[in-house]
Amino acid sequence: MGQRTSQATLQSSTHFTSNSDILKSFNDRALKQFTVTELVSFKNKLGKDLNERLTNEELTKWLSVPQDEILLRELLYNFVQVLGNFPLMKNSYENVTGIGVLKAIILTNPERCKKYVKSRNYDQLKLWFIALSIRKTVKEDPNLSSSSSSEESFDVTRILKTFDGLHVNELSVPFAYMVPFISWLLILTTYCPINNCKLENVAMFDNWNSYIKSAHTILRSMRPMDESSWIEYEPFAHTMRSIAPHIFDPLTRVMEHLLFKDDELVDPLSENRGEIASSKLLNSALLAQISSALSKQLPIYHLQRLYLGRDHGFSMRSFQAKVFKWSAPTIMLLRGKRILDDEEYSVKNTRFRKFLHEYPKLKPSDMDTEVEEMYPAKSKIILAVYVSDPWKITNKEFFGGPHTTIVQLSPFQEVFGSSRENALYFNTIGGGIGIGNKQPVIKSTAKSYSPGNVSLTMDSALEFAVLRHAGQGGVLKPGLVVGDKDFEVKMLLQDVEVWGCGGEKELEEQLKQWEWEESEAKRRQQINLRSIGEDRALLEMAGLVGQAQSGGSV
């Protein structure tokens, strides 16, 4: 791959006389973060001098942004522009250039970023929010100081620590801009699982509206008042860290893919992986949304259809016949229509009336009206339950590993993780399916469910389900968005599906395959330094060749 040169140390005692000096120092330092092959491949893709201006059209084409998504193109161009002017994000706005894009590649990659800023605790998420929120079209004089004290102004340590004196709590991103941005990240989750991914798949944006829908779901977790509102930092950071911690992973990959020549890119969908799983309920957007919460636990390209209630019948017997032979993790998907008025619906449906009698109701006084508003009357409730262990009949016992997780996918995204093992039961003597519950009490003449504080209960006919959230102390942890709020949502199930995930062996093989493909691409990047021609000046500027440098083993 080629050895990396030692990084130029930027001590806090280094004296800078202007913002231009600071920018030049960080630009030079950025070049030293890359190998010879990476720089040459990038220069080949760039097709121009590193200091020449890049247009919006050029940059967004490389990043596979739909041409008709004007807001997204504007947002991403500004995003890269801000990162390209790091660390002076407030006072100096140069054009987007090749050097700026290289800095953006570094700053969107957690490992590269830590080395670049020389801090393992640097808050990258805050940096990204700043880059998303700042809009600046007029370039200021880079030699102007950011305060009245020039000595304080040119203190790089302070600039890094304070994000150039920006107050992030005073910044915000328009909801209208954030929707296509999150949608784009979700699409990349599907189509860019590796760094050297080829993004010329014409079908990528066929289901754009589905990804928009999933993006809305994630953004609702930030509790915006309406679609004309603005997203502020605190709800943004809390949501991304808690219920969508992997949403930015594909951003790292799509930026890294700029370091590969076009003939070194591969299409993951064409590499003998088959089509992405789909059904009446499941689609690629929903899978990407689940991946934002579960990441590597969900192998998008290896899901197997095991049970679909619509096709196989809504019964425990059909469920058992189709699912129990699968010896690896599974995802159970539920979609239901919320039952708004228990009493009114029980008059129409005698089976629901019987279920109400068996299920202990949460006291109305305990219900949080604010959370109730988060489940609109006509909204569909979609849940994904990740089950790491094989399913089995447990009429008295329980099963399930410590990674059992419920991910709510609609009407807003939420995560209910497991606090310990054995969170599930599959009761074939009338108890149905429970996650986070005690076993139901079943007698010849009566039945009584025992829901946990945070739990999901399904009746034995797979007709009704209840999501309860009533505090700490149970097998499942409270939601990370709703927190300590108490509520209960009853639903009429319309879809129940179970999809088989690849086991550890399959996941390991997939990761090894992707790693091999990337290493092969990097091997093909190897160049003969004696014939690099015009690229030699670039490498000398980076300190990788010339001046007694060997250029590394390439």
UniProtKB/Swiss-Prot annotation:
Keywords: Cytoplasm. Coiled coil: none annotated. Its main location: cytoplasm. This is Restriction of telomere capping protein 5. The keyword DNA repair does not apply. The gene is RTC5. It is found in: Cytoplasm. One of its GO terms (cellular component) is nucleus. Residues 280-502 form the TLDc domain. GO terms for biological process: response to oxidative stress. May be involved in a process influencing telomere capping. Belongs to the RTC5 family. It comes from Zygosaccharomyces rouxii (strain ATCC 2623 / CBS 732 / NBRC 1130 / NCYC 568 / NRRL Y-229). PANTHER family: NUCLEOLAR PROTEIN 7/ESTROGEN RECEPTOR COACTIVATOR-RELATED (PTHR23354), RESTRICTION OF TELOMERE CAPPING PROTEIN 5 (PTHR23354:SF130). It holds the Pfam family TLD.
